[in-house]
Amino acid sequence: MQQQPSPAELLVGLAPSDDAAVYLVAPDTAIVETLDFFPPIVDDAYASGAIGAANAMSDVFAMGGEVLFALQIAAWPEDLSMEQLETLFRGGVDKVREAGGVVAGGHTVIDREPKYGLAVTGRVHPDRILRKNALRVAMRSG
């Protein structure tokens, strides 16, 4: 992706990339934003929704954040039932709720292959952001 000028408020962006973007909105509050989606990895629609939601939210958690809300994104074949899609969405909604967040909307398109995921918005204190390039293995004695 082409590099672009970044505002000072963009604490984590493309260079170097990490699990999610982080944007400072107040001295003690930064927004964590991520998007993940992929084809189902299990046959159960509810489990697929829960797995997709957990995967997307894990990027917010990896940055040290808490989940606020999410938007679902799905690609759905016309030959699969709407009931299966609703079950998939229910799995995602339940998993986001379990993490303390809420699903606030989303978007669905017709495609040949099913895909599902979420854009997740979280919050973190700027002093508590966890970065991949700053991780250290804990030393253990004894």
Which residue ranges define each predicted feature?
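N-terminal glycine-rich phosphate/pyrophosphate-binding loops that anchor nucleotide-derived ligands
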Residues: 1-62, 128, 135-142
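Glycine-rich anion-binding loops of enzyme active sites
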Residues: 25-40, 66-142
